[in-house]
Amino acid sequence: MRLVDGAAAVLAEANGRGIPVIVVTNQSGIGRGLFGWKELVAVEERIEAELAALGARVDAVLACPFHSEGRAPFRHPDHPARKPNAGLLLRAAEAFTLDLGSSWIVGDRAGDVAAGRAAGLAGGMHVATGWGSQPGEREAARACAGNGYRVLEAASIAEGPDLLPLLGECAGGNGR
């Protein structure tokens, strides 16, 4: 595990602006028995420590273990919390009193961007790191744009500072 170059700086900037940083992640590995919650927590704690050393933080991590090929009790053909469904984003909005219409999602999969649209977010930023560089991902993310939902493209989250002014603009300056 390694942080994407520039990620901590973007998160620190968001933290400084009062913009909640919430990770919503599909974790089918838990559902399929490849690893457990304990291992996921260990990885998240390591990320938290690395970010803290760089002056940044994540406010919450919401994970979905459900998968169509998961083992009981995590086997589900289309769980509402699993992206591209909106469930995790709706839970985050409830827990943090977020205005979804002023919120954005950043992700490396078209399903992340699609989840943002399904939840009624203002937009999504598709990054080409991780899965984002796979054939068809960028095009599928672009296809989510429309009806007021904006899709931006970036090489990595390091370009995220370009997104931060949009958050303030959408939210009347409060960044939520």
Go through each PLM region and give its residues.
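Short, acidic loop-to-helix structural element flanking the phosphoryl-transfer center
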Residues: 1-22, 30-45, 80-90
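Short secondary-structure boundary segments
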Residues: 1-14, 57-60, 64-72
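Asp-based, Mg2+/Mn2+-dependent phosphohydrolase catalytic module
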Residues: 37-60, 68-105, 109-176
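Short, charge-patterned binding micro-sites
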Residues: 25-32, 64-70
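Short beta-strand segments at enzyme active-site cores
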Residues: 20-26, 59-64, 126
